[in-house]
From Swiss-Prot:
It comes from Chlamydomonas reinhardtii. This is Dynein regulatory complex protein 10. It comes from the Eukaryota. One of its GO terms (cellular component) is axoneme. Residues 126-167, 197-287 form a coiled coil. It is found in: Cytoplasm, Cytoskeleton, Flagellum axoneme. Component of the nexin-dynein regulatory complex (N-DRC), a key regulator of ciliary/flagellar motility which maintains the alignment and integrity of the distal axoneme and regulates microtubule sliding in motile axonemes.
Length: 356
């Protein structure tokens, strides 16, 4: 066979190999989704896939493969001709193991044919000598394998004897395990009975504790409602006191404005007293804000059952402290107002004396 004929044979094999490679991408998943791949593969190729799928389904019931073979050849022809056939390679479908094996065998066949067609007489003779040498090696290897098999049989007999000894030990161990399991079951039954009795006792104790805690919770809620109402009343009183204090401050400011023509020293003293009153008012406002914030924090902490009594006592202490602060401030404020009235009377007497 000359090189031209060899090239033709290889060309035919390459064409067949390309057809097998293209048809390997036509998996069952591709056939099932042929309608969805119409835009990707084109109308003709999608219709061919749908027709091929229908023929395969009908061939399962009729056992007629002629139409399937003809459809396969037509599908291979379209795959070779269509430029969109390469897009099948990017689909997330795996090819079957059988088609991959066929493709591999056909590639090996093509390589073997190419090697045979391009091999000279000398190379063929050399290959035959190499084949004879390999065959001799294989025969020697087979003989060695038979010897090893005989040795393996002897070893198996020895292992079977050892296995019999091991089986006796295993039976003895199983008997001991059975005794341990029996004693374990008895211990388990005793432990379960004890645990069940302890569980009943714990349930009874828990119910008693739950009733006690429920009563304490109801009492704490009633105390919280009372404290809230008391705090609300105190807050109303504080607002009234603040309003009265503001009115008194306005009166004092008017009196100070009327005495602008007085001496500079008296004016400075009046301003100092006025600033002191404002500072006390700011302290009062700050104390009121702190009391309000503490009340919010108290209500939040009251939701915790473990701190109910402690929080109620703490709030009572804070309210008593606030009342003492307010009373102290009010006594100081009354003293300041009485002092201001006395000073105003002195100023009036001084003015009357000057007029005389």
């Amino acid at each position: 066979m000359n090189s031209l004929e060899a090239g033709r044979v290889l060309s035919v094999l390459d064409e067949a190999l390309e057809g097998i490679r293209l048809i390997s991408y036509v998996t069952q998943d591709v056939l099932d989704t042929a309608e969805q791949l119409r835009d990707m593969l084109g109308e003709d190729l999608a219709n061919a896939l749908i027709k091929h799928r229908q023929l395969i389904q009908s061939a399962k019931s009729t056992l007629n493969n002629d139409q399937v073979q003809a459809s396969t050849l037509e599908l291979v022809r379209l795959l070779k001709k269509s430029p969109s056939a390469q897009r099948l390679q990017v689909l997330p479908y795996e090819r079957t193991y059988g088609i991959l094996q066929t493709l591999q065998y056909f590639e090996q066949l093509r390589q073997f044919a190419q090697k045979r067609l391009t091999t000279t007489v000398e190379e063929d003779s050399s290959n035959r000598e190499f084949f004879e040498e390999v065959r001799d090696r294989e025969e020697r290897a087979v003989a060695e394998q038979e010897q090893l098999k005989q040795k393996l049989k002897l070893q198996r007999v020895e292992l079977q004897k050892a296995a019999g000894t091991i089986q006796v030990s295993e039976d003895r161990a199983r008997g001991e395990v059975s005794e341990v399991q029996s004693s374990t079951q008895q211990s388990r039954a005793a432990i379960e009975g004890s645990a069940r009795a302890q569980s009943e006792a714990d349930k009874s104790s828990f119910q008693s504790d739950l009733d006690q805690v429920t009563k304490e919770l109801a009492a704490a809620r009633a105390e919280l409602a009372r404290l809230r109402q008391e705090h609300k009343d105190n807050e109303a009183l504080l607002r009234k006191a603040r309003k009265r204090a503001e009115q008194d401050v306005e009166v004092q400011i008017g009196e100070y404005d009327a005495d602008v023509g007085a001496k500079e020293e008296e004016l400075g003293k009046a301003r100092a007293e006025y600033e002191e009153v404002l500072r006390q008012l700011q302290e009062y406002n700050s104390g009121w804000s702190e009391m309000y914030q503490e009340r919010l924090e108290y209500e939040e902490r009251e939701r915790r059952l473990a701190d109910q009594r402690f929080q109620a006592a703490l709030l009572a202490v804070r309210q008593n402290h606030a009342a003492r602060v307010i009373q102290s401030y009010w006594r100081g404020f009354k003293k300041a107002r009485e002092a201001a009235k006395k000073k105003a009377k002195k100023l009036e007497k001084a003015k009357a004396a000057k007029k005389k």
